[in-house]
A protein has these predicted regions:
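Conserved anion/nucleotide-ligand pocket segment
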Residues: 167-227
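Glycine-rich, charge-decorated loop segments at or immediately adjacent to ligand/cofactor-binding or catalytic sites
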Residues: 70-75, 145-167
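A short helix->loop->beta-strand "cap" motif at the edges of active sites that frequently abuts
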Residues: 56, 139-143
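Single conserved hydrophobic/aromatic residue that forms the stacking wall/gate
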Residues: 1-10
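Glycine-rich oxoanion-binding loops at beta->alpha junctions
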Residues: 79-109, 121
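Short internal beta-strands
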Residues: 59-67, 147
C-alpha cells in the first residue's frame, strides 16, 4: 500500500560496509586485500581503518585510477607504494598479464574485499577494474567479498548496449551506457552470464544494501572521483 511505500522512502539506507556483523565472520583468520579508494568510508572512518582497529589482517590494498586516497589525476599512472596513514602496501593493478595483478600479488591474500562507490556508467572505470580483479581471483582461487553501495543513477537505464568489438579500458561489458545496477548486482550478473574471460566464475559473496530500491534517491556523500 501507498503509506508503507512512503514510509520505506524514509528508512535510512544501510550500506554493505556498515553491516559488520554480516561480514566480519567471513574475514576472520583470513589474509585480506581490499579494493577501495577515498569513497570507502563507513560513516566518518575508512573501511581499512575499521578493519585494522578490529585486528583483521589486511595485507594489501588495490587502488583504482586516482589512487587510494583519491588524489591522482585521471589516467595518471599510480605506482605501487604504501598507504602513508597505515603502512599497508598498495599493490599495482596492472603489473601482471592482461592488465591484471601479478601472480605474486594474488598469492599474498586469501580474500579480496571490494568497497568502492560507482556511478552506474559504462565508461566509468571502477567496474572494469572490479571485473579484472574478479577474473584474477577466479584464476587463483581467491574469494571476493563485495560490500555493496547504492547506484546514484540506479533509477533508469539508457543508451545502446556496447558492441563487444569495441571493448576497451572505458567499456568492458555488453551493457548500456547507463546500466542501472549497483556494483554488487553487476558483479553477480558478470558471474551469471559468464562474462569473465574463458567463462570463469569467481567465488563471490555480496553484502547488499538494506532499505535500498532502484527508486530510492541516493546522494553521494563523497565525490567518487576528484576531478
Amino acid at each position: 500500500d501507498r503509506s508503507s511505500a512512503a514510509s520505506d522512502v524514509y528508512k535510512r539506507q544501510v550500506l554493505g560496509d556498515e553491516q559488520t556483523s554480516e561480514y566480519f565472520p567471513i574475514l576472520k583468520g583470513k589474509r585480506i586485500a581490499i579494493f577501495s579508494n577515498h569513497t570507502g568510508m563507513v560513516g566518518d572512518k575508512h573501511l581499512l581503518d575499521i578493519l585494522l582497529e578490529n585486528k583483521f589482517n589486511v595485507v594489501a590494498i588495490f587502488s583504482p585510477e586516482h589512487g587510494f586516497r583519491g588524489d591522482a589525476d585521471a589516467g595518471e599512472h599510480v605506482s605501487s607504494s604504501v598507504d602513508k596513514k597505515t603502512g599497508v602496501p598498495i599493490l599495482s593493478l596492472y603489473d601482471g598479464k592482461d592488465k591484471k595483478p601479478s601472480e605474486a600479488s594474488m598469492r599474498k591474500f586469501d580474500i579480496l574485499v571490494i568497497d568502492i562507490q560507482d556511478v552506474g556508467l559504462r565508461f566509468y572505470t571502477y567496474y572494469i577494474t572490479m571485473c579484472r580483479l574478479m577474473d584474477a581471483c577466479a584464476e587463483y582461487n581467491r574469494k571476493v567479498l563485495l560490500l555493496d553501495r547504492p547506484n546514484p543513477n540506479g533509477h533508469y537505464v539508457d543508451g545502446p548496449i556496447l558492441d563487444m568489438k569495441y571493448k576497451s579500458g572505458v567499456g568492458w561489458l555488453p551493457i548500456p551506457i547507463v546500466h542501472g545496477m549497483t556494483l554488487g548486482e553487476l558483479a553477480l550478473m558478470v558471474n551469471g552470464e559468464r562474462w569473465l574471460p574463458a567463462s570463469r566464475v569467481c567465488d563471490l559473496t555480496v553484502i547488499p544494501c538494506k532499505n535500498y530500491t532502484h527508486q530510492t534517491k541516493y546522494t553521494l556523500p563523497i565525490p567518487p572521483s576528484p576531478n
